[in-house]
Regions:
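Cytosolic juxtamembrane amphipathic/interface segments immediately preceding
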Residues: 8-21
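Hydrophobic alpha-helical transmembrane segments
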Residues: 113-133
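Hydrophobic cores of alpha-helical transmembrane segments in multi-pass inner/ER membrane proteins
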Residues: 124-129, 210-225
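Short, highly charged, low-complexity non-transmembrane loops/tails of multi-pass membrane proteins
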Residues: 230-255
Length: 257
């Protein structure tokens, strides 16, 4: 009986899912980057007169952020942030957060970013820390769970106390005056530091720092694990393909490569 010659076929082409799996970090930077940076375009669109596109952006991101204007950053206006009293004077004299959040700005005050200051700190820090992690990926091990919890704790405490404070009404709660901090520090700092949400205030610093720490914790825990698992999956795929080729060769010594 003549020998049967088997031609080994090349490794099949990658599917889209395989490509994403092998290039997951680039896919993350692009997809998450578009999602996290798009809110910064909202005030630019409004300034350019593209109000429909700008309002659509605000609407989409309203599902991911409270967008309260007194806790948001503004572009193209007199100030970067405005106190609640100025927002109420320009919009409506109300403490209803569902009404306040609809104020996106005007020509004089500028236009707010579709993220609040906390979300800017949290969401963008994940993207930035991920970018910084990549060159260190082979050396940096996942952070321990207790350190991860400690990094999340400031944002949990700050966010939950703000939520409780807002139950008394926007601008009326204990996190709006921070009298507890005045007593704790013996009123050693300026009134502008204790009260309100302006840049440089305690509330502003708390949201900025807690968001950065939470973003650092998420990247430091999740990304090393993802990198390790993706590396193992790629090695497993190569091993499986190599085993199949070896089995074919063993069954047919005259197989042509």
């Amino acid at each position: 009986m003549p020998a049967v010659t088997t031609t080994l076929t090349p490794k099949p082409k990658q599917s889209i899912l395989d490509w994403i799996s092998n290039h997951w970090f680039a896919a993350f930077l692009i997809v998450y980057g578009v999602w996290v940076w798009l809110p910064f375009l909202a005030p630019i669109l409004m300034k350019l007169g593209l109000t429909t596109a700008g309002n659509i952006t605000y609407f989409i991101y309203s599902f991911f952020c409270h967008q309260l204007p007194e806790r948001s950053l503004f572009f193209f206006g007199e100030k970067t942030m405005y106190p609640l009293a100025e927002i109420q004077a320009a919009w409506q004299d109300t403490s209803n957060p569902m009404i306040l959040r609809k104020f996106v700005g005007n020509e004089a005050m500028g236009w707010k970013i579709a993220w609040s200051d906390r979300m800017i700190s949290f969401y963008t820090s994940i993207w930035l820390f991920a970018f910084a992690w990549w060159p260190l990926r082979r050396k940096l091990k996942p952070v321990s769970w207790w350190v991860f919890a400690l990094l999340l704790l400031p944002m949990i405490v700050d966010g939950s106390t703000h939520a409780l404070s807002d139950l008394a009404g926007i601008g009326l709660g204990f996190r709006d005056t921070n009298q507890w901090l005045v007593a704790l520090t013996n009123n050693a700092l300026s009134p502008a530091f204790y009260a309100g949400d302006a840049l440089g205030s305690f509330n502003s610093w708390a949201r900025l720092i807690s968001g950065l720490l939470a973003g650092l914790g998420i990247v430091w825990l999740a990304f090393p694990y993802i990198y390790q698992s993706q590396g193992l999956n790629q090695q497993l795929n190569q091993l499986n393909y190599g085993v199949v080729l070896e089995q074919i060769k063993n069954k047919n010594p005259r197989a042509a490569g």
